[in-house]
UniProtKB/Swiss-Prot annotation:
This is Small ribosomal subunit protein uS13. It comes from Shewanella sediminis (strain HAW-EB3). Located at the top of the head of the 30S subunit, it contacts several helices of the 16S rRNA. In the 70S ribosome it contacts the 23S rRNA (bridge B1a) and protein L5 of the 50S subunit (bridge B1b), connecting the 2 subunits; these bridges are implicated in subunit movement. Contacts the tRNAs in the A and P-sites. GO terms for molecular function: rRNA binding; structural constituent of ribosome; tRNA binding. It comes from the Bacteria. Keywords: Ribonucleoprotein, Ribosomal protein, RNA-binding, rRNA-binding, tRNA-binding. Belongs to the universal ribosomal protein uS13 family.
Length: 118
């Protein structure tokens, strides 16, 4: 197993699919990385040489991925909550942020129903 950005990449998968296992890299970005490093998208990770894996590591290092990206997202949410803006308040109350109705739906975001006390 190759290790890129602190993640063990599965050997038996194609390069594009294997790169999407890294948080912050989707199909489009994985294809762009393969294009810049001139590695075939359908080549399996186990078929790549160590030099090609090193070029993949360098290409992935140019992007914000994994722990840094998770930290950045959580800091953005925390900033919204500290500002007290509408989106921050919705985050704090665990409600939908983007204008969805909450009278009947939004069970995933709100969690299980709480019984009404009498």
């Amino acid at each position: 197993m190759a290790r890129i950005a602190g993640i063990n990449i599965p050997d038996q998968k194609h390069t594009v699919i294997a790169l999407t296992g890294i948080f912050g890299i989707g199909r489009t970005r994985a294809r762009a990385i393969c294009a810049t490093t001139s590695i075939a998208e359908d080549a399996k990770i186990k078929e790549l040489s160590e030099a090609q894996i090193d070029t993949l590591r360098e290409a992935v290092a140019e992007y914000t991925v994994e722990g840094d990206l998770r930290r950045e997202v959580s800091m953005n949410i925390k900033r919204l909550m500290d500002l007290g803006c509408y989106r921050g308040i919705r985050h704090r109350r665990s409600l939908p942020l983007r204008g969805q109705r909450t009278k009947t739906n939004a069970r995933t975001r709100k969690g299980p129903r709480k019984p009404i006390r009498k």
